[in-house]
Amino acid sequence: MNEQRLAAEMLPELEVIAGMRGLTWVTRVTLIVGSMHGVSATSLAEEFERVFADTNFDDARVEIVIVQPQEEIKAPGRADTMTTNGWELLISKMEGRK
């Protein structure tokens, strides 16, 4: 999956999650992406910035963390860790204004 398609497909989900969290304007998003998606962290962040234009994510800072299969990471929103499989698409952090 390329960066453009991944960002475009994730935007509606990110908007729903922002709404569930009561955020009217998102200022920062950190995503954990498995390496099996074959994307570059820099290119994916730039693509998210492009698809965020004219949305409540406009000008949000985007950070992409690429993880390898069998990597131990802290599970977002939980105290425990998880072993990655390389296909992750996880929201690690979302900040903004209510």
Residue ranges and their predicted role:
Residues 1-98:
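Charge-rich, low-complexity N-terminal segments
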